[in-house]
Amino acid sequence: MHPLRCVLQVQRLSAPFTSMCWVLLRTCRAQSSVSSTPCPSPEAKSSEAQKDFSSRLATGPTFQHFLRSASVPQEKPSSPEVEDPPPYLSGDELLGRQRKVYLETYGCQMNVNDTEIAWSILQKSGYLRTSNLQEADVILLVTCSIREKAEQTIWNRLHQLKVLKTKRPRSRVPLRIGILGCMAERLKGEILNREKMVDLLAGPDAYRDLPRLLAVVESGQQAANVLLSLDETYADIMPVQTSPSATSAFVSIMRGCDNMCSYCIVPFTRGRERSRPVASILDEVRKLSEQGLKEVTLLGQNVNSFRDNSEVQFNNAGSANLSRGFTTNYKPKQGGLRFSHLLDQVSRIDPEMRIRFTSPHPKDFPDEVLQLIRERHNICKQIHLPAQSGSSRVLDAMRRGYSREAYVALVHHVRETIPGVSLSSDFITGFCGETEDDHRQTVSLLREVQYNTGFLFAYSMRQKTRAYHRLKDDVPEEVKLRRLEELITVFREEASKANKTSVGCSQLVLVEGFSKRSTTDLCGRNDANLKVIFPDAEVEDITNPGLKVRAQPGDYVLVKITSASSQTLKGHILCRTTMKDSLTYCTT
């Protein structure tokens, strides 16, 4: 008997509740001498399949069905779902068993916030936190990749920790070292291959996975999760406030960035933009208010492009308005609750809580945002406008979406709309192809705008960026450093002039504590986010005439400014007050 010969025929079908799928149909042909039921012909099978498809299509959901489903708000679970542990790990293995974790943070304020998110997750799994490196069982470094210098700092730190790990007494549990954040995302392969003493890698979107990763590490393996997410915002995780005397807090409202500036690694290490639901942000701010905190900073890589699309009824709204003369590198986004709505709602929670936000993009300052900042007394009159360069040619190479002229026009518009506003900015010197004339234009922008605060850096090329693939890092390092020094000098001169306009004025200051340089001076920050130093003294409480008090962290006080530098104001305290009452007395 000849063996059976099988022929596989692939036919594409459609099921009513799924997308198109591939189905394998087995048809068999046997030798005519073999006694078997004959298979239908291909034509018959095709006709039968078409009839079956038509029947299922007629009884399946219609377009109206999907419209009705979309218009009905989905019931939200009372608590976030907790995924079952992988089958090879028991629930007990995911517990920290009171092992001590030491967390070390590098880079931006988002990393500081991420550190508290990671700690909140580990705390719930039974880990303890320690500030003593020597007693730690797990050391986690929350890292930054924005510049080469930041990464080199981490490599140097790992060499130091390697000594600590090799000298670990055998009587103690093995020391585990993990790299978290942007550097884990950018250099995952190099870290695991170059530094065998690193046990764990977790990218910015993988902190929920830390208990599992640590459990895998305990089995003697390296563990890594650096997957980027399109929707992870950690909205359900309340960061742990580790300082009991803290007067302010940062609230992350969105993650990632879609701007794709040619020099920037952020979209590749933190992924696409996604925003937290407004309701979860408001809930976190309310809790911080109840804890007595007096200042909240809304945080995001591109904070003012916030767009909450979680509520269906707001998804059909039009696209956002951009600052005049500004463009985007992406298609305009439609719908959602925008930053102006969030800022409005947050500022209404507690009239005695100051509201800030960082870091914005200049393109996302429509008039409704500026008007709101002007009208609300508890939204700080301080705006960060990252320029990056004063040369339109360089700005075009950076893919910033604006010219020098458009940027300067925005500065004038902001100052006209918000009298007395304080401005800060970011600048990069030595970008690809930057000439001496380009550099002089940046110097002239610093003099023209006269920022109160500035953050200036020499360009550091990052792999994966558009500049890495399409431009040449052709400005010598010594030239970059020389230009940076020139920018810093000019910035300090102009900032000192700008800040000296406050001398003689009375300003509202939120007390943070004693000055680091003197136990007799107090330190706080004004509306412009400038540090204000003033002698500790007994003063009157304006809300309770006749009562003499000494200012404490978290108090609002009026301070008369007597001197100013490029970074600090000095003065003497007048009284303790509230935000509302201070409106009568502040002269700036």
UniProtKB/Swiss-Prot annotation:
Q: What happens when the gene is disrupted?
A: Knockout mice show a deficiency in ms(2)i(6)A modification, resulting in impaired mitochondrial protein synthesis, which leads to respiratory defects.
Tissues and organs where the protein is expressed, per its UniProt entry: Expressed in brain, liver, skeletal muscle and heart.
Q: Keywords, A to Z? A: 4Fe-4S, Iron, Iron-sulfur, Metal-binding, Mitochondrion, S-adenosyl-L-methionine, Transferase, Transit peptide, tRNA processing
Q: Name one Pfam family in it.
A: TRAM
Which GO terms of type biological process are on file? mitochondrial tRNA modification; negative regulation of cyclin-dependent protein serine/threonine kinase activity; positive regulation of mitochondrial translation; positive regulation of translational fidelity; regulation of cyclin-dependent protein serine/threonine kinase activity
> Region entry Disordered: which residue ranges?
33-53, 70-91
Which residues are in the TRAM domain?
500-575
Residues that bind [4Fe-4S] cluster 2, according to the entry? Answer: 257, 261, 264
- Indicate the residues annotated as transit peptide: 1-30
Q: PROSITE patterns this protein is in?
A: MTTASE_N (PS51449), MTTASE_RADICAL (PS01278), RADICAL_SAM (PS51918), TRAM (PS50926)
Protein family according to the UniProt entry: Belongs to the methylthiotransferase family. MiaB subfamily.
According to its UniProt entry, the function of this protein is described as:
Methylthiotransferase that catalyzes the conversion of N6-(dimethylallyl)adenosine (i(6)A) to 2-methylthio-N6-(dimethylallyl)adenosine (ms(2)i(6)A) at position 37 (adjacent to the 3'-end of the anticodon) of four mitochondrial DNA-encoded tRNAs (Ser(UCN), Phe, Tyr and Trp). Essential for efficient and highly accurate protein translation by the ribosome. Specifically inhibits CDK5 activation by CDK5R1. Essential for efficient mitochondrial protein synthesis and respiratory chain.
Quaternary context: Interacts with CDK5R1 (p35 form). CDK5RAP1, CDK5RAP2 and CDK5RAP3 show competitive binding to CDK5R1. Probably forms a complex with CDK5R1 and CDK5.
- The name of this protein is Mitochondrial tRNA methylthiotransferase CDK5RAP1
Q: Which organism is it from?
A: Mus musculus
**Gene from which this protein is expressed:** Cdk5rap1
